[in-house]
Amino acid sequence: MTVADRTRLDNFDATRAKAIAEARAEGAPADVATLDKVLAGDLLPLHSYKFDGDWRCRTIKIGGMAPKLVVYGWFKCRFHEDGAGLWLDKTTGSQRTRGLFYDDGETRMIYLGKSHYSYEKPGLYGDDPTRDQVAYAYRVGPKRARIEFPAPQYESLLDIIELERE
């Protein structure tokens, strides 16, 4: 993990709190209600859960820009495991991500990924620092998870990918 990404994670709580406060203060009421739903739910254990398979996913951009809250439509994501560990691929939409998860306690994982456009071949974290992504991932329901990206490279203070198993 790069020093810059370690710093993003070290500042996660403050970044997250500021982004959510901005979104709640200035976001459209329907979008704030969606955000509150996404943030709801107890953090559940990860170790015995099987993420493999197809999920629907959407990105929510929070704070830092105008508007302060943007909720995008649903796309498709896929989790799979191999010898390296658990992977996520966002498989539809113009902006995508691919990355690997690492254990970080009973209820949280660290995601190290790389953003790419639909017309590009997916790469790996570390290939291009301007495309590197770092996040914390949580399971928040029997068929729900979210990945929170503090201080992403562009636009917002916090990005969340909301995931629901299909």
Model regions and ranges:
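Amphipathic/hydrophobic helical signal segments and adjacent flexible N-terminal regions
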Residues: 1-50
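Edge beta-strand at a domain terminus
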Residues: 32-37, 126-137, 142-166
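Mid-length scaffold segments of soluble, non-membrane domains
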Residues: 46-109
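An anionic, turn-rich surface loop/hairpin at beta-sheet edges
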Residues: 64-75, 110-136
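Short C-terminal domain-edge/linker segments immediately following a structured domain
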Residues: 84-90, 119, 141-146, 166
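Short, solvent-exposed aromatic-acidic interface loops
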Residues: 91-98, 114-119, 149-156
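A short, polar/proline- and glycine-enriched secondary-structure boundary/capping micro-motif
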Residues: 96-104, 120-126, 156-162
